Amino acid sequence: MKYCTESLILILAVIGCISAAINFKCPKGTAEEKHQKEIYDLVQRINRPLIPQFKEPNFPTSFLIKGKDPKEFFQAIGHLPKKEVFSLFDERHWDEAMTAYEYLYEAETLDDFIDIAKILYLHLNEDMFYYVFSFAVLYRKDTRNVRLPQVHDVYPDKFLKTDIINKIKQANYQGKQHPVIDATKEFHDLRNPVSYLHYFLEDIGMNSHHYHWHVMNSALRKAYPTEGEKKFYRKGELFYHMHHQMLNRYELERLSNGLPRCPTFENWDDPIAEGYASHLAVDRTGYRYTFRPDNLHVRDLPELTKDNMRVWRDRIFDAATSCSVLRENGSFVKICRTRFYGGLNILGNLIESNLRSINRMFYGNIHCYAHVIAARVTDPDGKYGQGNGVMYDVATSARDPLFYQWHKFLDHFFYEHLTKLPTNHLFHLQNPDVSITNLEIISNGRKNEIHTFWENDIMEISKGHSFTLNSDAKVKIQHLQHEKFEIHLTVQNDKGEDTDLFVRIFLLPLEDEESHELSLEEMVRMAVDIEKRVIPAKPGSNDIVISSRSIGAPANKFFGSFEERYISEDCNFHSHCGWPNYLLVPKGSSQGTPFAFVVMLTLAEDDFTPNMDDTCFCADSWSHCGSLFIQYPENVEMGFPFQPIIECTKEEFFALPNIAKQEVIIKFTGETKDSPLVIQLENDS
């Protein structure tokens, strides 16, 4: 346990800083040092096979006083074998995971919570345990000051390919201390054009974000009577918005690399044209994520046929286009009566098939089983005992190009629904009190040109994994990065008083892969939400500068050691959900790819919930991740002003005084630079 203890001293000091530095208005965590130590020690055991087991604690007295039966407890858990991968997409895992979560969430005290967690750890699949434990820590009020390692800290072998894991293991066998392994080399093949997108598809930060989004916005969360009801009021819409944004970022990377827009996988009798090999395995268990060759066909599963999914598809399409959703009691709810987001939320819950779906029996589980049926395409009935593909696991699914093809199919339901809503006319979009008189993007002294490049970074893997038995390891990885840029706005406030403005910043493509100009509809359907924030404006002219470094989750949230990652002056609470800052803009091309920054201003009093306590939501990326304990802070559609459909021409839209467009060139330099972590490592060696 020495390797846990050394790390623990530092992390407890950091957590103490966090607790002292913030005066929470949101629920303030009450975990003391002893609780934090026990929680951290418990998580450190996950995916580390040689840590000695602890004695199973007795059930808490409060558990027994409430009349809960330990026999029922043990009957409800332990069904998913220890060596399997837990899948949030596989409904067969839901009952066990949900039961475990409820035991944790409803524990009366922190001591009870920890005792129940220890019991669960000994009997639950470890993968499932990490998910439900993270979920409970996130939403219990008394654990608000507890930090857990991120999924790539706990399962680095779900993010690093087997050849890298084997090199780490070999270095450990040879007795090397603190080995540094180079994982910056990428394999590309002209026969597989998507291999040139692996820098995005297999990015550690992006895949970690996707996993933790599904923790923060879990499909398993029921409607609890207090904070849960507020928090999940717009969960279905957020499911659509975040995955729509992931799809759009992928589209921009395809355009940057001269590839056509992402195809839609909608005819399930057609072969899956693009294969995918992840080269991933969970080293401790030997579980390998199955390779999918090109042109395989989706086949029926023993528990689910394609015809079942077609029935669900047709029912959801009818609900989206008829504006009428069937409840379980046989009545209908209308979802197209107003411009606002209620219908998107109901539809999103239906499509994700989460526990807030109005009628899961009728509308089924199309999103989750799209993942499952795709993941089991090589061995659908288990005849050969093959593992599942990466689409099965939330931590790995966004690596597969099929993920985006499936989500583009699901995206179509939402688009059809949006076409049935009252459109956004010019009077919905304009605001007579504010205007933008100038917009410029400044990067390294250049106007309206942003350079991107490769950046080497360090992922640290702690001691105790099956491949780091004798020493921790550092892995040099490579990710996309951009030069720092600033968004310079000149804003005219004609309200006659100090005013808070709500600023929305988007990045839009201007041309397709063949350099043809895109229509307004095509542009806005691929719009990427860069930032939303409140800015103060005095009467008259205001010069406002927004730095790219203040947007999204910084690289040091993902890389370096877990302990050092949280030594910062900003002791804000982190849910681990947040789009990586280094992926803020697409790669662009060597000759330069044209895009447009679009900025819209409205009054914060109209569009943003006032008197918000920003410790309640993920300050890094609330637009993508939502909020903790409170309602989503934006008061209109999450995709506004591009949702619902805009009823005007391109010229009319960009001529609105409170909207500004600035064309920019994003140019990939081909350079490779070292991050501060790499520079520090080289200086220390």
Swiss-Prot record:
Glycosylation sites: N329
Gene3D superfamilies: Di-copper center containing domain from catechol oxidase, Hemocyanin, C-terminal domain, Hemocyanin, N-terminal domain
Coiled coil start-end: none
Binding site for Cu cation B: H367, H371, H407
Superkingdom of source: Eukaryota
Subcellular location: Secreted, Extracellular space
Binding site for Cu cation A: H210, H214, H243
One Pfam entry name: Hemocyanin_N
Keyword Secreted: yes
Signal peptide start and end residues: 1-20
Main location: secreted
MF GO annotations: metal ion binding; oxidoreductase activity; oxygen carrier activity
Disulphide bridges, residue numbers: C577-C625
Record keywords: Copper, Disulfide bond, Glycoprotein, Metal-binding, Oxygen transport, Secreted, Signal, Transport
Cellular compartments per GO CC: extracellular region
Function comment: Hemocyanins are copper-containing oxygen carriers occurring freely dissolved in the hemolymph of many mollusks and arthropods.
Protein family (similarity comment): Belongs to the tyrosinase family. Hemocyanin subfamily.
Protein's UniProt name: Hemocyanin subunit X
Source taxonomy: Eukaryota, Metazoa, Ecdysozoa, Arthropoda, Myriapoda
